[in-house]
C-alpha cells in the first residue's frame, strides 16, 4: 500500500480549509484516509496558526514510507521536518523562440540604422573637408 501525506479539502464554498492527512494514493482527495496529521487554513494571514502540524506523527509516517505531496513538502520544509530539493531552471525566465527571433531582428535593424547614420555623417563631413582644401 503506497501512502501519501496530502491535503484533503474541507470548509465551505469559497472558504477553503485543508486537513493534512495520510492516505492511500488510490483513495479520493476528500475520501478515506488513515490519519489526520495537521491542518492548513489559507484564509489566515501568514502566521503560526495558518499551518498546524503534528511533527511526531509526520516523522513516523515518513519513516513508514509515506511520500509528502509538493504543497505539503513546502510546509514540512518551512517547519524544518523535511528538506525540499532546490529546483534549478535557468532558462525559465528567457523569452521564447519567436520572441528571441524578433529581438534579434530588431537589434540587427537598429545596428543597420546606426551604420547608415554613421555613413551619412561621414559623407556630410567629407564634402566639407574637400571644399575647405580647395
UniProtKB/Swiss-Prot annotation:
BP GO terms, sorted: translation
Biased composition (Low complexity): 115-134
Region (Disordered): 80-134
Cellular component terms per the entry's GO annotation: cytoplasm; small ribosomal subunit
Gene3D superfamilies: 3.30.1320.10
InterPro entries in alphabetical order: Ribosomal_bS16, Ribosomal_bS16_dom_sf
GO molecular function: structural constituent of ribosome
HAMAP family assigned to the protein according to its UniProt record, in alphabetical order: Ribosomal_bS16
PANTHER family the record matches: 30S RIBOSOMAL PROTEIN S16, SMALL RIBOSOMAL SUBUNIT PROTEIN BS16M
Family to which the UniProt record says this protein belongs: Belongs to the bacterial ribosomal protein bS16 family.
Name recorded for this polypeptide: Small ribosomal subunit protein bS16
Amino acid at each position: 500500500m503506497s501512502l501519501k501525506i496530502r491535503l484533503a479539502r474541507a470548509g465551505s464554498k469559497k472558504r477553503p480549509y485543508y486537513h493534512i492527512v495520510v492516505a492511500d494514493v488510490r483513495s479520493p482527495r476528500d475520501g478515506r484516509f488513515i490519519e489526520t496529521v495537521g491542518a492548513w487554513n489559507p484564509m489566515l494571514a501568514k502566521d503560526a496558526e495558518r499551518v498546524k502540524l503534528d511533527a511526531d506523527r509526520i516523522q513516523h509516517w515518513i519513516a513508514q514510507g509515506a511520500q509528502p505531496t509538493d504543497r505539503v513538502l513546502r510546509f514540512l520544509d518551512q517547519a524544518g521536518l523535511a528538506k525540499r530539493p532546490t529546483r534549478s531552471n535557468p532558462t525559465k525566465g528567457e523569452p521564447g523562440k519567436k520572441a528571441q527571433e524578433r529581438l534579434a531582428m530588431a537589434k540587427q535593424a537598429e545596428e543597420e540604422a546606426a551604420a547608415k547614420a554613421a555613413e551619412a555623417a561621414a559623407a556630410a563631413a567629407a564634402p566639407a573637408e574637400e571644399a575647405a582644401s580647395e
